[in-house]
C-alpha cells in the first residue's frame, strides 16, 4: 500500500539531536512554536499543537525510527487513528528526516501534507539552523 504522505527534509544536525528533540516536550514545543507533551517511552501518549494532535508512541528505535498512532481533533468521529512513521537518516553531515503518514481520513492527504511542511519542516529548519554551531574561521 502506498503511503498517503511521504515527504523528507534535510536538517543540519545529527540524527541523535533530531530524534531526541522530537521526543522531548520542551524541544518539540520550541521547534513547532506550540505546546507539546511527549516522552521517549514506548506506549506513552503524546500531544502537540496545544492538543490538536494526539497519539501513542508504538515503536521507538533510538536515532533511527519513531512509529506512532496519530490523530487530530479534525478526524471524523469514530475514525481510526492514522499511522505516522518518522525516519532519521545520516545525510552529508546532517540528517534526512522522512515522514510516512498512512491511514488518514479520505480526502485529507493534501491538507496534512501541507501541515507537515508548514507547521513542522519550516519552523524546524529555522530552529535547527539557529542551534547549529557556528563555523570556525580559518
Protein language model regions, located:
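Hydrophobic-ligand binding "helix-grip"
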Residues: 29, 36-37, 47, 51-96, ...
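A conserved amphipathic terminal alpha-helix motif
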Residues: 103-138
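Alpha-helical scaffold segments that form or flank carboxylate-/histidine-based iron centers
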Residues: 13-14, 45-49, 111
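Charge-dense, helix-prone N-terminal extensions
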Residues: 2-4, 9-10, 16, 43-44, ...
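Conserved short-loop catalytic and cofactor-binding motifs
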Residues: 6, 34, 45, 100, ...
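Hydrophobic ligand-binding cavity/cleft-lining segments
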Residues: 1-37
Amino acid at each position: 500500500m502506498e503511503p498517503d504522505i511521504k515527504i523528507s527534509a534535510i536538517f543540519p544536525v545529527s540524527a541523535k539531536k533530531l530524534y531526541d528533540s522530537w521526543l522531548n516536550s520542551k524541544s518539540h514545543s520550541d521547534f513547532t512554536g506550540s505546546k507539546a507533551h511527549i516522552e521517549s517511552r514506548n506506549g506513552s501518549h503524546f500531544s502537540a499543537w496545544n492538543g490538536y494532535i494526539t497519539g501513542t508512541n508504538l515503536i521507538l528505535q533510538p536515532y533511527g525510527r519513531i512509529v506512532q498512532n496519530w490523530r487530530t481533533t479534525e478526524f471524523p468521529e469514530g475514525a481510526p487513528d492514522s499511522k505516522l512513521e518518522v525516519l532519521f537518516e545520516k545525510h552529508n553531515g546532517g540528517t534526512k528526516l522522512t515522514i510516512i503518514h498512512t491511514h488518514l481520513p479520505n480526502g485529507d492527504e493534501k491538507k496534512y501534507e501541507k501541515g507537515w511542511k508548514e507547521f513542522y519542516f519550516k519552523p524546524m529548519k529555522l530552529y535547527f539552523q539557529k542551534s547549529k554551531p557556528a563555523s570556525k574561521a580559518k
